[in-house]
């Protein structure tokens, strides 16, 4: 099973390459309740990541690096209510 530090390293590796501004971990890994079947939930502020091709490239790069499924969301792609539900449990992976 992955550690938060492993996820942070993977996101940092690709963050600059894909031009993301900030990335946060949420869900089971952020809450410390992940198991072998858990995917990795990440929400990003896109920064320079503006095309679907770039988004897909980042997603596939993270999945390859981590060896597991990644649920990659963007801040502007989720409703404010959803963000309110996750903001207290999120962990900064990359950015400010």
Model-derived regions: residue spans:
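Short hydrophobic/aromatic beta-strand micro-patches
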Residues: 43-45
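Conserved H-loop
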Residues: 28
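Conserved histidines in hydrophobic membrane contexts and catalytic metal-binding motifs
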Residues: 25
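Catalytic core of pol beta-like nucleotidyltransferases
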Residues: 1-22, 31-36, 47-96
